[in-house]
Amino acid sequence: MYKVIARGGMLAALGLLVACGGGGGSGGSAPMPSPSPTPPPQKTLFVATQPVGAVQAAVFATQPVVNVRSNGVTDTTDNATVVTVALVAGTGTTGAQLTGTTTATASAGVATFTNLGISLAGTGYQLRFTATGITDATSSAFSISAPPPTGQVSFNIDSTQDVHAISRFIYGMNGWDPTVRPKNLTLSRSGGNRMTAYNWETNDSNAGNDFHNQNDNFLGGGTEPNGAVRPGLEAARAAGAGMIVTMPIIGYVSADHLGNGDVANTPNYISVRFKQSVARKGSAFSATPDTTDAFVYQDEYIHFLDAKYPGAFAAANNPLMIDLDNEPDLWQSTHARLRGDTNPATQAGTTATYAEMVQRTTDYASAAKDVNPAALILGPVNYGWQGMIRFQDASDANNRDFLDFYLAQMKSAETNAGHRLVDVLDVHWYPEARGTCVNPDPNDSDKTHCRITIEDTQAGTVAARKQAPRSLWDPTYTENSWIAQFSTNGPITLLPRLKGKITANYPGTRLSITEYNYGGANDISGALAQADVLGIFGREGLFAATLWRLASNNNFIYGGFDMFRNFDGANGSFGDTSIRATTSDVAKATVYASVDAANANRMVVVCINKDDAAQNATIAVTHSVQFHTAKVYQLTSASPQGQPQAQPDVAVAANSLQYAMPANSVTTLVLSP
């Protein structure tokens, strides 16, 4: 029995519950004790992002983030707790000091540190995080690397930053033959000036100003429809690669292959030597095209390909894609006979206009999409810079940027059609960068500077070639070219510039470069530039790219491809996912890194030493897996036929390694646990 004492709220203070019996009852229920009071929340600190070391006396590559937790859950109402960090005594190197701001105030329960570092190199460092009245937390152990020797470079790789898929179609080449070097490419293209007037029904084509403006059968293929394109197309697709075919949109294609010189020597040559190339047939397609009529139908070409290769336009890894002609901004000179110049002594046709290009693109792209909506359409296939900005001074340019106009018009065309017509913005890029030289080119008026695309290996040309890839992206680099001097008045930053136009005018459009070349085909400088370009294409998110060869011996350019696609001679390849990779000196050395989406235990790093002296590289890696070994493949000027050579493995400790890069070399490292 409980004795109840009624005194000034004593019952409540004692936490007792009293039950009284009701009227007529025999006694009452025994009083029950009240529930225990709710304990105050237990607050703890939790290291949400572990610190990742870098080089001594530098800020951490990854700064720590600490959560203030209440009963195991981040307290998002906490905007006041001050978290203090200190080195755990006895860890790391004796005498080391923690540098930077050692306090951080929580915001929504999260305290983020921004500039911490440690003064001395060492291993096993730990940090302790404390706050008044809150259970503290300790970080995982981490390492701090010694700085590289003076004048050397450091690379930092972080698989948690800038992570995105690499398009498989950036490793391409025009007219690729899978049976010879370079192996294991991913895209081929049937393009070039010859395709502008290519008759897919008969394989006749016109050389334009490349060779006397004559009609001939230079492309081969006999009388089989698409015979000139078929062997390369089928070889590429059998090798697992995609294929870009060209749909002519100039309005005429060759009607014969007489090979008798300039077609302008034939009276009424347009009607006699050419057939009208029409976007739409307007009637049922034929399994075999009619070669006796006056027309060649381009939608029937797409139907022919679709029937010959079912599902190819929608294939994931080896699709068919369609380029809308080739360099239409140069038709007036490359195919002057089809642009109104009937004089065999001149090459001065009429330049296509902005409006004409939009209309032709709309007509032919919509015709192709009506046959197969899955077909990827690439356009406008500009030849280069002046074509991109003014369409080679088209009569209706009116100081408007051509690509801005083109993209905006294609967006409107999509609205009208109810679906996309152009999927990929396609341009060509032959750099105009020049280096100091004694110019051997008799057709070049500049006798003291050489364009890097020629096969010159004088020191100034080589130096310019090695730096030229930076104009694809680097806002701090200005090349020596007429573009940088008179058009951009500074850095070109080609890829960010083009992506910015897409974002502003037609979001969702992809980007390709279906012809490019940096010269030095059989020189180590060509390999360095090619490898650099492939790394940039992957990092910057390009959709597709195909090299156009300018020389007969391309061994070192092929070597540049090998370092990404066949470094071990067994199709060893760069990963499918790009991650952050930074260099301390972009002029001397660049670095690109990848992981595999399906395999965290493999990381591939490509290191490019552009310096004429050997460079010792310190490589620090942030990754979820601890690596222990790096397989090494190397390309130098001494590499036979520009082929990579395997080197002894290098040990990796605490995800850090030192590697001595030979002068002017490309090194591919394959890291594994």
What are these regions (language model features)?
Residues A165, I170-G172, G242-I244, P319-D323, ...:
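Structural preference for beta-strand elements that scaffold enzyme active sites
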Residues N156-V296, E300, D323, P328-A352:
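N-terminal substrate-binding region of glycoside hydrolase catalytic domains
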Residues V650-P673:
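C-terminal beta-strand-rich structural cap/linker in extracellular carbohydrate-active enzymes
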Residues V18-A19:
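C-terminal motif of bacterial Sec signal peptides marking the signal peptidase cleavage site
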Residues D523, L534-V604, Q641:
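Glycan-recognition and catalytic regions of carbohydrate-active enzymes
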Residues G27-P148:
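Core sequence-specific DNA-binding domains of diverse transcription factors
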Residues V586-Q626, T667:
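Carbohydrate-binding surface patches
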Residues V296-Y309, P328, H335-S525, Q530:
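Noncatalytic carbohydrate-binding groove/subsite architecture in carbohydrate-active enzymes
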